[in-house]
């Protein structure tokens, strides 16, 4: 009886363990659900990752040590980025930390800008004012340069020109920039050129040629010739690639509708001239014909001279020249006109007339001289031409086109006919602007393409991503704590249920024991009554009892 009861108890315990959640009451289930939701909300609001913001970047070693020790004393969490260049703290504590560090005077190596001029004292000398202005200007330029990518720190030194009435030759301003580049980074031409222009535009009368840029290793970065050559070569390569890609796209856009998308491959090589050419030409064309002649100016000059010599025979003492008279008539005219009958040379006409006459009372010898110059100036056929050729002209093109076989009616791949290849070649020539003068070459061939093998690549797994060990350990501890709490709650409820069941079992066992006891008591009472009856029978009829005992013995 006892063995059967213990086996029944074990079966009941197993059923209780298996059907624990089903045996739970509705109130207990609701309480468990509310508890789990509370844990999730608690984790989201109290254990979520903090939003970090940049406190300072590119700190020196001394400032970094001082600031970190101060954050530790304030019990504010902090961390650095992967490059160890930015100090990060929670965003909600940013203002508090700024104020506290400002009270401590941190960081000490902070760049000073134009705010230095706000604290000038009264009675400051001119020299101190100039020095403060230079310091403020250097600090502002250094701040601007440090905003650029790949630059960790920057220092700027400026020598300004001093104007004075006693100095005739004005000093040219100059500047030097020292850059500390981030590890593993470099500056390209555009970034260096931008730094040069920032400094040049920030200082009055400063030329780019007077700016020197040096990195932390002592390398000179401001060599304009090298910068220009590097940039020019990069731009040339980029321009050539764009030209070749444009021609390639033109070829594919023409041939793809004919042969299909994946049935054509084109390659274009362009030789481009980047030489700068300027041509000046001056030509003189002779204009012998009268129709092409154009008169620029005409000069007509006429000079007439008169002289008379009188001689009287009655006056012997007054022989000789009695009178001498000259008349000069100068006529100059400059005319601008076109005339077909005017010769193309200078004409000079000279005429001299002499006349003599004899008088009775005197001897008169009149003389006249005429000098005439006629000059015509013609315009020359003069042509001056200035030709400037564009940079980036295509000198020669080489085009190669490969076309795949096409399918026939039976689905087999066959080559294209010669006529089709020739027509395709003509289309290619027209699309790229083929020119024999340049020596362009176009080649179109027909081959069967090989079918590429398809490799299925699995999508990238998230397990390959970088996971911080600290975050993983914290998450593991949180999950472990939640699991332990859930197990404790489940165990407590299970123990409560078991305790109730044990009470029920004990009560039932007690009732069974009582039943057994009552049955045993009833059996004892029955034995007593039998004994009484036997004793009464023995007394009344001993012979019958002897007969019964003999039968029991005989069997």
Swiss-Prot record:
Keywords recorded for this protein, A-Z: Bacterial flagellum, Cell membrane, Membrane, Transmembrane, Transmembrane helix
Main localization category: membrane
Localization per Swiss-Prot or TrEMBL: Cell membrane; Bacterial flagellum basal body
GO cellular component entries: bacterial-type flagellum basal body, MS ring; plasma membrane
Transmembrane region(s): 30-50, 472-492
Gene Ontology molecular-function annotations: cytoskeletal motor activity
Database matches in SUPFAM superfamilies: Porins (SSF56935)
GO biological process terms on file: bacterial-type flagellum-dependent cell motility
Record-linked InterPro entries: AMP-bd_C_sf (IPR045851), Flag_M-ring_C (IPR013556), FlgMring_FliF (IPR000067), FliF_N_dom (IPR006182), YscJ/FliF (IPR043427)
Membrane topology, record value: Multi-pass membrane protein
Function description: The M ring may be actively involved in energy transduction.
Family: Belongs to the FliF family.
Subunit: The basal body constitutes a major portion of the flagellar organelle and consists of four rings (L,P,S, and M) mounted on a central rod. The M ring is integral to the inner membrane of the cell and may be connected to the flagellar rod via the S ring. The S (supramembrane ring) lies just distal to the M ring. The L and P rings lie in the outer membrane and the periplasmic space, respectively.
PANTHER family on file: FLAGELLAR M-RING PROTEIN
Protein name: Flagellar M-ring protein
């Amino acid at each position: 009886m006892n063995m059967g009861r213990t086996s029944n108890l074990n079966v009941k315990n197993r059923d209780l363990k298996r059907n624990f959640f089903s045996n739970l009451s509705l109130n207990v289930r609701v309480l468990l659900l509310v508890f789990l939701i509370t844990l999730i909300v608690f984790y989201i609001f109290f254990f979520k990752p903090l939003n970090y913001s940049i406190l300072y970047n590119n700190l020196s070693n001394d400032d970094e040590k001082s600031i970190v020790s101060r954050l530790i004393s304030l019990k504010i969490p902090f961390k650095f980025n992967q490059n160890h260049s930015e100090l990060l703290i929670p965003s909600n504590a940013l203002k508090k930390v700024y104020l506290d560090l400002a009270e401590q005077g941190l960081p000490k190596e902070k760049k000073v800008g134009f705010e230095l001029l706000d604290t000038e004292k009264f009675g400051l000398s001119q020299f101190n004012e100039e020095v403060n202005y230079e310091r403020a200007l250097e600090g502002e330029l250094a701040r601007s340069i440090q905003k650029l990518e790949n630059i960790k720190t920057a220092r700027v030194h400026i020598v300004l020109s001093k104007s004075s009435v006693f100095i005739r030759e004005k000093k040219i301003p100059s500047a030097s920039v020292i850059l500390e580049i981030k590890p593993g980074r470099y500056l390209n031409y555009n970034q260096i050129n931008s730094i040069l222009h920032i400094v040049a535009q920030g200082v009055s009368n400063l030329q780019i040629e007077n700016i020197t840029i040096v990195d932390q290793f002592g390398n000179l970065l401001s060599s304009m010739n090298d910068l220009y050559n590097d940039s020019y070569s990069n731009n040339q390569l980029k321009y050539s690639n764009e030209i070749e890609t444009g021609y390639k796209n033109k070829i594919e856009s023409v041939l793809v509708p004919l042969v299909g998308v994946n049935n054509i491959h084109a390659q274009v090589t362009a030789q481009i001239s980047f030489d700068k050419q300027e041509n000046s030409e001056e030509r003189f064309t002779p204009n012998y014909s009268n129709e092409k002649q154009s008169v620029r100016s005409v000069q007509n000059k006429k000079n007439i001279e008169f002289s008379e010599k009188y001689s009287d025979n009655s006056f012997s003492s007054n022989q000789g020249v009695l009178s001498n008279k000259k008349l000069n008539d100068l006529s100059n005219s400059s005319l601008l006109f076109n005339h077909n009958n005017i010769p193309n040379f200078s004409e000079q006409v000279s005429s001299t007339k002499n006349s003599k006459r004899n008088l009775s009372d005197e001897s008169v010898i009149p003389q006249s001289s005429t000098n005439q110059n006629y000059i015509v100036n013609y315009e020359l056929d003069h042509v001056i031409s200035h030709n400037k050729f564009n940079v980036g002209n295509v000198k020669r093109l080489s085009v190669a086109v490969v076309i795949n076989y096409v399918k026939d009616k039976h689905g087999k791949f066959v080559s294209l006919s010669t006529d089709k290849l020739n027509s395709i070649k003509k289309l290619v020539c027209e699309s790229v602007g083929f020119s024999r003068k340049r020596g362009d070459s176009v080649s179109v061939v027909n081959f069967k393409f090989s079918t590429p093998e398809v490799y299925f690549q699995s999508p990238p797994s998230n397990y390959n991503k970088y996971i911080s060990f600290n975050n993983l350990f914290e998450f593991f501890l949180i999950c472990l704590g939640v699991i332990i709490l859930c197990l404790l709650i489940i165990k407590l409820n299970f123990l409560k249920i078991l305790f109730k069941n044990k009470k029920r079992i004990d009560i039932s066992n007690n009732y069974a024991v009582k039943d057994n006891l009552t049955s045993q008591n009833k059996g004892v009472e029955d034995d007593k009554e039998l004994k009484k009856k036997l004793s009464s029978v023995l007394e009344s009829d001993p012979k019958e009892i002897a007969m019964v005992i003999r039968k029991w013995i005989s069997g």
